[in-house]
Amino acid sequence: MVYSYTEKKRIRKDFGTRPQVLDIPYLLSIQLDSFDKFIEQDPEGQYGLEAAFRSVFPIQSYNGNSELQYVSYRLGEPVFDVKECQIRGVTYSKPLRVKLRLVIFDKDAPAGTVKDIKEQEVYMGEIPLMTDNGTFVINGTERVIVSQLHRSPGVFFDSDKGKTHSSGKVLYNARVIPYRGSWLDFEFDPKDNLYVRIDRRRKLPASIILRALGKSTEEILDIFFEKVNFEVKDQTLLMELVPDRLRGETASFDIESNGKVYVEQGRRVTARHIRQLEKDGVDHIEVPVEYIVGKVASKDYINEATGEIIVNANQEISLEALANLSQAGHKALEVLFTNDLDHGPFMSETLRIDSTVDRISALVEIYRMMRPGEPPTKEAAEALFESLFFSEERYDLSTVGRMKFNSSIGREDAQEQGTLDETDIIEVMKKLIAIRNGKGEVDDIDHLGNRRIRSVGEMAENQFRVGLVRVERAVKERLSLGDLDAVMPQDLINAKPISAAVKEFFGSSQLSQFMDQNNPLSEVTHKRRISALGPGGLTRERAGFEVRDVHVTHYGRLCPIETPEGPNIGLINSLSAFARCNEYGFLETPYRRVVDGVVTDEVDYLSAIEEGQFVIAQANAKLNEDGTFADELITARQKGESGLHPREHAQYMDVATNQVVSIAASLIPFLEHDDANRALMGANMQRQAVPTLKADKPLVGTGIERNVAVDSGVTAVAKRGGVIQSVDASRIVVKVNEEELVPGEAGIDIYNLTKYTRSNQNTCINQRPCVMPGEPVARGDVLADGPSTDLGELALGQNMRIAFMPWNGYNFEDSILVSERVVQEDRFTTIHIQELTCVARDTKLGSEEITADIPNVGESALSKLDESGIVYIGAEVKGGDILVGKVTPKGETQLTPEEKLLRAIFGEKASDVKDTSLRVPNSVSGTIIDVQVFTRDGVEKDKRALEIEQMQLKEAKKDLTEEFQILEGGLLNRVKAVLIEGGYSEAKLDATDRKKWLELTLEDDALQTQLEQLAEQWDELKADFDKKFETKRRKITQGDDLAPGVLKIVKVYLAVKRRIQPGDKMAGRHGNKGVISKINPVEDMPYDEKGQPVDIVLNPLGVPSRMNIGQILEVHLGLAAKGIGDKINQMVKEQQELAKFREFLQKVYDLGDTRQKVDIASLSDDEVRTLIKNLRGGLPIATPVFDGAPEASIKALLELADLPTSGQLTLFDGRTGDAFERPVTVGYMYMLKLNHLVDDKMHARSTGSYSLVTQQPLGGKAQFGGQRFGEMEVWALEAYGAAYTLQEMLTVKSDDVNGRTKMYKNIVDGNHSMEPGMPESFNVLLKEIRSLGINIELEDEE
């Protein structure tokens, strides 16, 4: 295995045994690919903006004299980059410019003669851009558009499973769902008539739609029924016999032919009888006349002589009609073939309840149903029916829909057509009737072949199309009005509706969500989330159990573990590790192909539909060296069922053991030993871990930590290989390798790092370099760690030394006892950054002002403000301190213009303003780390704003100059190389000024050309630098574009350091969560024989009932890993030679039968030293999901570390020094601190705001509310008999308005007594009873 430069620094020992056939694909591709498809110009016009434009344009005027055509579009450059957008609170977007062509036709000349053509580029609003990490910056905040799982367009056959009708009869239905347009439903009623509904409106007999398509009764019967022919011969009836049709019938007469009786009357016809009849070639049999009575005629029979109809099509034949027929000379009769078994008379029955007779009456009936109350005309009815399913503007099945539709009804042609046609409708009805007849199956709507993913690009395109359609109407009207000679395309198009539609989608759609930015994992999983909710999806209330449940087709596509607990369970899913979307939007998962019993490394991606017919072996099937299966019988899946199959039958095999689960679940080591419910909690809680001050890699991981850290985008990753030229806290410079250079560039890559910025969840984002100057790096190497990453690996928590034992009741019911050492070492200290904003507005009474001159505020309160009234950076502030001084005019009266003038001349009166300063919220204290001032264009900047501006300009200049110098240095080094090659001596060059080198000349023409090219590049570089600086300067100095009425915004950033404390929530990765009950002194904690105290004591009773045994194995393996680290430390102390270390490390990495082969001999001495340095804290271990370290390997590793193989140690009580009587399980567990901190939840109220109606205190910390004293609490006080306490709880402490004021007065007067009055909620109750019409009054006791 080849390790990258960063990986070599700390090689993770891998216990996985299955070879890695496929790397985990880029985790954010579902977002990025989809959006690229939307924005990329697609010559076919299938996807994205191009498709939206082509579907709406050209727009023709109503009179047909002109049309507006679409030519092409282009996206401009964004004004601000991502960081600037976040600071300024604007949307990161590109302007969309569309080239349109207005064609005006000559009215007087023949049709199609062009009179005038005008082309122009029109601005059509802004299109938000996706950042490199798959997010959008909307109004300054990072948002994610979650993909939606919705029902695929197509046709679905379903049944009500006998729930609708009381008899329990199963009613079948078919539904045609288009991508856009009206739904078409066919359904049976309990009487077996077939009905149709359009858009879920009232139902009509299904034959109406066929009549509206122009079919007569005869044609309809012809489509749906087989016929039986009868012949009248000398007073007897001969029936044409198709023996197969008799199957299952009871003979109502002797079936005989040529005197031979085949079936006696009253007997049932069996397969044997049919074979006999077929063998003897019987094709006609004689039937009694009564047999035909009650059969249904298949066409009209007319008396040729009189022209009257004897029998109508679809009319039952009676004896009388039979006599009339033979009288009129009809010798042959054709009737419909029906039976109760598999040829029901459904369509014939339906025609009888259909009141319409011809096409027009059917169209009118449909019109009445769709538009009740409007008088129907023939034209309107025809136009409506045409527009419902047959017009491309109104109806589109989409490519997916057509593909699903055709495969469902078995149609081969009409691949591209988006609308329905006659064949489609008839075929759907035929299939539905066939299903009712017992042939065919209903569809499973929860099958992933019937649900598809709608990603960002597709949703944005749909919204964009909605905007265009709104514009289309306006354009049509403008084209039809008056004179077009002076009109340009720009005058026709109003970009407002388009940008409004796009803005609404990105800003407030249910699927556009505020990004979960707790840690890198929560970012990645948020982007990989698949939601069944949202517009066009399900709603929480209506979603039943089936939709939420795990379906067999989820295997390898959606994770069965990771889903939220609560009302959304099963509706919000996560993409599995290897899953991807195909071109139709269906989820696919990869499988290894098995050819002639040999498993190959070729990988095929199969969708849920394709997977059905294959036998797929599991990833843990044992293989021989040559790739054949080792066992005769293997566990495999076919059609979603798991079972044992002979090895010859296998056609595919899973690619990896973690193929089934999502990224978050793949991060749980020993997941295979955890109960699913706990694994779900574990996966969800990792997303809530807060990044700690010093990230600490997990000792026991699963090997995909690196993928998450790198793909999440929080680390700085090398774009190209090279050598590190310089490193400081905020930037890394890489000199690029020669072979990766683009000809004619300076060959320097500069990575600017993010320092101490605020995330969406107020956690701290900070990048730290993890490379040193002179180190070689390759493309994809990690250069800097972000939050929660350590040497390029995800590190959500800390490795803690843990003991499973009770300790004085402090770990009762999942409480956690923590050692004081954890606090001292800042193991779980986190930094939180809050943004507080102060806005100065223009009010009716005059403008608000930001100033240090605040009325009635003492000197000490202003000590942290500068003269502009804004807090200093670095100031330590606590609750209630002023951050930004602001005064607002308060006027009893609005001023007249004259008064305003006098005020302006003679200055303000101090009493006319009130203090509205921005203060630190009550429960917060911390350090000011940054201040930003935004001033409206045209408003004078204050001193602080100018200082900040100067500082930003200085920094920008410094950054750009350094960048320029680095690039210039690279360029001049290449100039020097050329000059030396051309004969100049190095000493002479060093003596000359470097800028003059470019003016020197060379004899060699080729070298002179090279030199001139380099000189040109230098000029370009200089010009580029000047241009960049000018742009930057303009951005910094120009006024800001603020909301209407806002003059100035001051943003203050406050950093809070939170140490761990009782009440904080912590958890492991196995769903083992708890709250800290006590921080115990180190000397009281249990310690082992070496005197090493444990950090955390957990309750052993938290394990058995929860069945998450994975945590115990993790603890054992963690102990061994740490033991190896201790052993290396010991060797370092003894100063053993490097060879010994190499030998020991080789032994460690070779342990167990694993796929990983680490050759320590191939590492250089320096690399081994780095490795030793990084392993001293413990050997990092990977135990992949479902392929983890076996018990034997754990024991072997413990042995290697000289630790007891039981994983248990004798512990001593820290308080008494006595040994505990039993050995205790001690080891290292990876613990997370979750974002449920006691500081954010702790809250107390004295007095505050009250609810308007009930006059009771509000609830919740945000409203500064009170604690609810509910029903059960009242019972408790009743049980104690504490009557007075109860009385004050229900009156003066709650909603007795007069009592509250009296009590306040009494307290002020020093009189500590109370007089309870009437609670306001009692008055509310009285009023509510009165509203029911019952008068109820309180009478005083006199």
UniProtKB/Swiss-Prot annotation:
It comes from the Bacteria. Keywords: DNA-directed RNA polymerase, Nucleotidyltransferase, Transcription, Transferase. GO terms for biological process: DNA-templated transcription. GO terms for molecular function: DNA binding; DNA-directed RNA polymerase activity; ribonucleoside binding. The keyword DNA-binding does not apply. GO terms for cellular component: DNA-directed RNA polymerase complex. It catalyses: RNA(n) + a ribonucleoside 5'-triphosphate = RNA(n+1) + diphosphate. Its EC number is 2.7.7.6. InterPro entries: DNA-dir_RNA_pol_bsu_ext_1_sf (IPR042107), DNA-dir_RNA_pol_bsu_external_1 (IPR019462), DNA-dir_RNA_pol_su2 (IPR015712), DNA-dir_RNAP_su2_dom (IPR007120), DNA-dir_RNAP_su2_hyb_sf (IPR037033), RNA_pol_bsu_bac (IPR010243), RNA_pol_bsu_CS (IPR007121), RNA_pol_bsu_protrusion (IPR007644). Pfam families: RNA_pol_Rpb2_1 (PF04563), RNA_pol_Rpb2_2 (PF04561), RNA_pol_Rpb2_3 (PF04565), RNA_pol_Rpb2_45 (PF10385), RNA_pol_Rpb2_6 (PF00562), RNA_pol_Rpb2_7 (PF04560). The RNAP catalytic core consists of 2 alpha, 1 beta, 1 beta' and 1 omega subunit. When a sigma factor is associated with the core the holoenzyme is formed, which can initiate transcription. Belongs to the RNA polymerase beta chain family. NCBIfam families: PRK00405.1, rpoB. DNA-dependent RNA polymerase catalyzes the transcription of DNA into RNA using the four ribonucleoside triphosphates as substrates. This is DNA-directed RNA polymerase subunit beta. It comes from Vibrio parahaemolyticus serotype O3:K6 (strain RIMD 2210633).
